[in-house]
UniProtKB/Swiss-Prot annotation:
Induction: By drought and salt stresses. Disulfide bonds: none annotated. This is CBL-interacting protein kinase 9. It catalyses: L-seryl-[protein] + ATP = O-phospho-L-seryl-[protein] + ADP + H(+); L-threonyl-[protein] + ATP = O-phospho-L-threonyl-[protein] + ADP + H(+). Residues 27-282 form the Protein kinase domain. Residues 318-343 form the NAF domain. Residues 168-197 are annotated as: Activation loop. Its EC number is 2.7.11.1.
Length: 456
C-alpha cells in the first residue's frame, strides 16, 4: 500500500532526517508498530486525554477501487459494537482524502508469540489459562457473526496485566465473503494454522475454521512447536489435510484427547465451541468473562468515514518536535536503554520491530547496513533515509523482508528503526542475531553503559 500520509516526511536539513509528528484530528501519530499488505498500524496519543492508542491506517482509494465499501462498513460497524475484555477495542473511525483511520485500544504487553519464543513452551495450566481467554473472545465474536480467519500467536496480544487480547478480528471484510451456499470461499490465514477445509477451497464454515486455528495455537503453547510443519508448501498442505496429530509425552491424557477433538479434519464432526466449554480438560479453573455495561455506541463516524463529503474529512497536520523532546522520550521509554539495547535483543528479546541509536552519520549507518546485508543474502533498496531489505530465498511464509529508517533525534545522534514487513517471525529473529553482530561498532553506548559492559 502507498506510504501513509502520517509517515515522517523526507530528509531534514543538515546531518540527517528529523522525526516529524502528524496530527490527525485530535490524535498525534507516532512511529509505525505494525505493517501488513493493506494497512499500517501506528502508535498515537490523544491530545485531549493524553491516552496512548493504536491507529490502523488504510488506503481509502484501495477500498474504493476494489468496491469493498459496504463490506468494510458492515464489518467495522460490527467490530465497533463489540466490547469484550479479550478483544482489542475499536474506538473510532475517521477518514482523510486518501486514508481511513481506525482508532484502536493500545495493548502494551507484547505478543503471546514472544512468550513462546523466550520460554520454549508454556506449562499446561498457563496454556489453558490463555486458551480460556482465547475461546471467550472467539465465542463472543462468533455470536455476532464475526469470524477471524487468521488466528495465530502473532495476533494474540498481552496487556500490562498479562490478559489476552485478540487483534484483527473482523478483517475478513477485506476479502470476498459468503456465497450463495452460505460458506466462506477465501483461503486467507497463515498456512500452518489454517483448517483443511479452507485449503480445499470448496467453501467452509467460519466458526469451525476458527476452532481449528485455536487448536493449533493450544498445541503450540504447550509443545513449543507446530503440529504440522514442512518447508515445502504442498507437503505442508498434505500434512494438514491428513491431520495425524502426534502429541509430545508431556501432554496429559486429557489434553491429548481434547486437542485431537479440535484437530479433526472433518469440520462436521469437529468439536464446537459449545462442546469445548463442556470439556473436562477445558473446564478446570475456568472463569466466564465479566462484562461491564457499556454505553450506547454511535456508528455515525463509520458512515462519515466512507462519505465523500468534504465536511466529514479529518485534517492532517505535520509538525516537527524539538530534538531534545524526542531524545528524552527514547531515553525514558521501557526497552530503549540505548547502549544496552543490542545486548538485550541478542539474548532473544527482539520482536517484530526494534531499534538502536548511533553517533555515526546517516550515510555511514546506511552504508554499514548495506554492507552487513550482502553476506546474509539480502537485497537492498534505498530511498532517502529508508531502506527495504529483502531475502533472496523464500522461507516458511515467503520472503523475509525488513524495513529500516534513520531518524535524527539530537545533533550527532541518530535512531535506526527496523521492523519485519513480511515473512516468518522466527526467521526475523535469526536474521537479527546475525545482523546485529555486524553492526556492533556503530551502536552508541553512553559512558555508564560502557562501564557496565566492561564489568560483565
Amino acid at each position: 500500500m502507498a506510504e501513509a500520509e502520517a509517515e515522517a516526511a523526507g530528509a531534514g536539513a543538515g546531518a540527517g532526517p528529523a522525526r516529524r509528528t502528524t496530527r490527525v484530528g485530535r490524535y498525534e501519530l507516532g512511529k509505525t508498530i505494525g505493517e501488513g499488505s493493506f494497512a499500517k498500524v501506528k502508535v498515537a496519543r490523544d491530545t485531549r486525554t493524553g491516552d496512548t492508542l493504536a491507529i490502523k491506517v488504510l488506503d481509502r482509494n484501495h477500498v474504493l477501487r476494489h468496491k469493498m465499501v459496504e463490506q468494510i462498513k458492515r464489518e467495522i460497524s460490527t467490530m465497533k459494537l463489540i466490547k469484550h475484555p479479550n478483544v482489542v477495542q475499536l474506538h473510532e473511525v475517521m477518514a482523510s482524502k486518501s486514508k481511513i483511520y481506525m482508532v484502536l485500544e493500545y495493548v502494551d504487553g507484547g505478543e503471546l508469540f514472544d512468550k513462546i519464543v523466550n520460554s520454549g513452551r508454556l506449562g499446561e495450566d498457563e496454556a489453558r489459562r490463555y486458551f480460556h481467554q482465547l475461546i471467550n473472545a472467539v465465542d463472543y465474536c462468533h455470536s455476532r457473526g464475526v469470524y477471524h480467519r487468521d488466528l495465530k500467536p502473532e495476533n494474540l496480544l498481552l496487556d500490562s496485566h498479562g490478559a489476552l487480547k485478540v487483534s484483527d478480528f473482523g478483517l475478513s471484510a477485506f476479502a470476498p465473503q459468503t456465497k450463495e451456499d452460505g460458506l466462506l470461499h477465501t483461503a486467507c490465514g497463515t498456512p500452518n494454522y489454517v483448517a483443511p477445509e479452507v485449503l480445499a477451497d470448496k467453501g467452509y464454515d467460519g466458526m469451525a475454521a476458527d476452532v481449528w486455528s485455536c487448536g493449533i495455537i493450544l498445541f503450540v503453547l504447550m509443545a513449543g512447536y507446530l503440529p504440522f510443519d514442512d518447508p515445502n508448501l504442498m507437503t505442508l498442505y498434505k500434512l494438514i489435510c491428513k491431520a495425524k496429530v502426534s502429541c509430545p509425552h508431556w501432554f496429559s491424557s486429557g489434553a491429548k484427547k481434547f486437542i485431537k477433538r479440535i484437530l479433526d479434519p472433518n469440520p462436521c464432526t469437529r468439536i464446537t465451541i459449545a462442546q469445548i466449554l463442556e470439556d473436562d480438560w477445558f473446564k478446570k479453573d475456568y472463569k466466564p468473562p465479566l462484562f461491564e455495561q457499556g454505553e450506547d455506541v454511535s456508528l455515525d463516524d463509520v458512515d462519515a468515514a466512507f462519505d465523500c463529503s468534504e465536511e466529514n474529512l479529518v485534517a492532517e497536520k505535520r509538525e516537527k518536535p524539538e530534538s531534545m523532546n524526542a531524545f528524552a522520550l527514547i531515553s525514558r521509554s521501557q526497552g530503549f536503554n540505548l547502549g544496552n539495547l543490542f545486548e538485550k535483543e541478542m539474548m532473544g528479546m527482539v520482536k517484530r520491530e526494534t531499534s538502536f541509536t548511533s553517533q555515526c552519520t546517516p550515510q555511514e549507518i546506511m552504508s554499514k547496513i548495506e554492507e552487513a546485508c550482502g553476506p546474509l543474502g539480502f537485497n537492498v533498496r534505498k530511498q532517502n533515509y529508508k531502506m527495504k531489505l529483502k531475502g533472496d530465498k523464500t522461507g516458511r511464509k515467503g520472503y523475509l523482508s525488513v524495513a529500516t529508517e534513520v531518524f535524527e533525534v539530537a545533533p550527532s545522534l541518530h535512531m535506526v528503526e527496523l521492523r519485519k514487513t513480511g515473512g516468518d517471525t522466527l526467521e526475523f529473529h535469526n536474521f537479527y542475531n546475525n545482523f546485529s553482530s555486524e553492526l556492533k561498532d556503530i551502536v552508541w553506548k553512553s559512558e555508564s553503559d560502557a562501564k557496565a559492559a566492561k564489568k560483565r
